[in-house]
Amino acid sequence: LHYFLAGLFTFLLIRTIGAGWVGALLGAVVYSFGGFMVTWTHLPSLISTAAWLPAGLLGVELAFRGRPLRGMLLLALALGMSLLAGHFQIAAYVWLVSLGSGAAHLVYRFAMRRRPGDTHPSPVGPAVALVAAVMLGAGLGAAQLLPSLELSGMSPRGGDRVSPEGYEFHRARALLPIELMTTVDPDFIGSPVRKNYPVWRISYSEHCAYIGVAGAVGVFLALLLGYRRPAVWLYALIGALALWTAMGGLTSYVYYFWIPKVGLAGGFSRLLSVFTLCAAVLAGLGVDALGKRTACSPTSCPPCARAWPLMLVALALTQALPWAYQFNPRTPAGQVYRPTELTRHLTDLANRGRVLEITEPEKWTLFDLPEALLPPNSATVYGYCSVNGYDSLLPTTYRRFADRVQQGIASPAANGNMILISRAFEVPICRYYVSSTPLLGEDELHGAERFRLVYSSAEGYIYEDRTARPYAAWRPDTEARAESAYDWESVQARRLGANRVRLEYIAAETGQCLLSEGYFPGWIASVSGQLQKPKLADETFMQLSLPYGDHRVDLVYRPASVEAGEFFSLLSLMAMIAVAVAARVSRRNCPESRT
């Protein structure tokens, strides 16, 4: 779907600029099957967001080409959908490039209007369209934007600050000059498919700048033959700035230190998304210029006049499609995360307690192939509860807790943002531990009170910690605060969904209930109809005050930021629909307005 959207919007963008269908088709192929879209398919949020970049630029072009209402609606849709797609670094590119293009159009329009006898329309209408699009786009994306802003304030990433050390860290991983050869040959350095990609380089996806031979020829033709078009210079400038920043040039300093938060996200090389699109637009304009230069006239017709542009499109398809299919072969869904005996046991244990997959952090780096027991996010696929995860999606309180357990940094920069706890076996923080090698010998297991071997095979080993605190535990207020996890009594708990938990208990006196659930604002507890907000306890968990008697407690995760975001998103969507319908009705009632 997102390959199609990326290609469709790129095609329409190039056509709107003024190129023919052949050039637009080449540009669509170059972007939708370029290095960024193809190699990031395994992380769908990136390509889902990048697909809206040409839509944003198309909205700007429409706004300045006599269709400000359509341009405003499309730009608002692109800005809002880029936020909803879920990858804020790429969404920032959509916003920056689209609005930067709009600003460039405004400057050009104002400059042209100052020339005597100029007939360009007033820039006021497009300027109003841009402002309205920003407001509607922000409102449309509020369902994702507001909760993410709340999470960033709680996340360990939210408190990060730019620093010279951080800048050098990103520059060391920037695109190298030799890697520019991947623009025409994606496997020039090597390929993970053929398993000859150098282990000393950062991931293949980060540094694949592929646009194809036909795309490169099209860019050259645009600069050689189509230089009279202002659009050629605009997209050449944007593409050059994106590429220079991706290579860690002077502009990367501005990008890192001057653009709030964006520089702290992934590496500079993800600006290849912008470069690839600009190259695609230039390729389309270049082929169009070639077609016009070689067009037949009443008196002469150059050899193969109409064939040259089509030959470039054919070359782009024959080079891009086999490579894309080889890199992302069609695979049955069941083969991606294939169930094994180990994962079946973990799924069976899902309702009994949390699981820690022990992976040594030093074995997980940005350069070496990770030696992990199970792939990241496998707990989500197989349906068990893991205590590992991404530090950008977990609160700072949990990161501090993980660092204390790890007796160091549980998520060092070298392994991205994975929280990998390997020393938790020494303290009872979860019920089950999974490892690729035995954690205890047979003599240590024999007669052990704490650990029990649940499963063992060539895949791995599962141990149960019988002293681990239950998911929900209770103690009366009359007791002194327990130092040990075993002093708490278990409370019957059932998870009714991702955001709902039910507790049932009978107590002879008032007490405190500690839940081994990460504390987030937004949890609301209903204790037999009485609402209560859980409190932060033991660094990262939740605690409730429970009255005596027979009670049922229903916990629901319903943060105000989500409800407010959904309200503003629906309001913006309704406003956009109302504007579109009103414009349609107006055109029907006033036929002369169509001319």
Task: Locate predicted features.
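Membrane-embedded helix bundles of polyisoprenyl
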Residues: 3-17, 21-109, 126-148, 315-323
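Transmembrane alpha-helical segments of multipass membrane enzymes and assembly factors
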Residues: 9-23, 59-68, 225-229, 286-293, ...
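Membrane-interface helix-loop-helix junctions at transmembrane boundaries of multi-pass membrane enzymes
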Residues: 110-128, 218-253, 296, 301-306, ...
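Hydrophobic alpha-helical membrane-interfacial segments at the cytosolic entry of transmembrane helices
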Residues: 117-149, 162-166, 235-243, 310-315
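Signature aromatic-anchored transmembrane alpha helix within multi-pass, membrane-resident enzymes
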Residues: 130-135, 281, 287-321
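Periplasmic/ER-lumenal interhelical loops and adjacent helix-loop junctions
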Residues: 137-223, 268, 344, 392, ...
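Extracytoplasmic
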Residues: 158-167, 318-490, 496-508, 518-520, ...
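Active-site-proximal, structured, solvent-exposed surfaces of multi-pass membrane proteins
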Residues: 217, 244, 454-458, 463, ...
